[in-house]
Amino acid sequence: MKVSRRNFLKTTIGSAVFAGSPAAIAKAAEGTKIPKRKFGRHEDMLTVVGIGGHTLYYTGSQKEANEVVHRAYDLGVNFFENAWGYHKGVAEEYMGNALKGKRENVFLMTKFSNFRGDGDPTLEGAMKHLEDSLRRLKTDYLDLWMMHNVVGNDAQDAYKSDGAIAAIELAKKQGKIRYGGFTGHTEPKIHREVIEGGYEWDATLMPVSVVGALKSRAFEEDTMPLCKKHNIAVLGMKGFGGSRRTHLHGQTSVEVVLRYALSYDQVCTHCLIYTSPSPR
């Protein structure tokens, strides 16, 4: 069955309300369009679902991207994520253009990836990624800037004097970001190393999936308690296991995926918005 972007957005937001606590549902009835959760140890409140930049690209045009972003915004979504490396910058450009006039009302996140081979693997390279992202997203600051997809020796490299943490701290000092974090898809062990290195991370993005794909169970069993211990906000992803099959074949639903993710207190939002034939 073909599902339109508009209908999936409506279904997802409805499921987000239904998946929330009774108090959240009561607030929704009073006019809050979608439940929110506290961003880790900080006071920011994020909607429990968000728009992902990677799939926003597959709308195919700026006009279609605008439609998705504006519809989600009107429904109350305030979390928008992206990455410097998504589709050679077009994903960030789509989002930046779509958020014109709305920037101050949203929580905007993007990622840098120069330390894993995309461009210049130095502090200067990371700052160039930041300037690129700010330009494309048409903003002078980010709410959250994250090191993209930690693997291999990334934990050790992040703590070097010219590594990712140095870039995050410099960007904070310059007033270009508010918070710093890191992401990962497949290596819970590396997540642990990054966290236990001692830096006070604000957030991490990792798989939280009811279908148990992409080592999500290992992330949930090993990384989630660490995040709770250090009061690190968890942003969930890959709720459908990174594949449209579980959704299109009726193996699970938006409501089930969200209920599962939100069963963890540390999860404050989940990137679970349909913008292509492949909800993730």
What is the predicted role of each segment?
Residues 39, 51, 80, 95, ...:
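Conserved, mostly hydrophobic/aromatic
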Residues 40-43, 96-103, 134-138, 195-198, ...:
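Acidic (Asp/Glu)-rich catalytic clusters
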Residues 274-279:
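Conserved small/polar residues in nucleotide/adenosyl-binding loops
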Residues 91-100, 124-133, 155-164, 186-199, ...:
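Distinct, well-ordered alpha-helical segments
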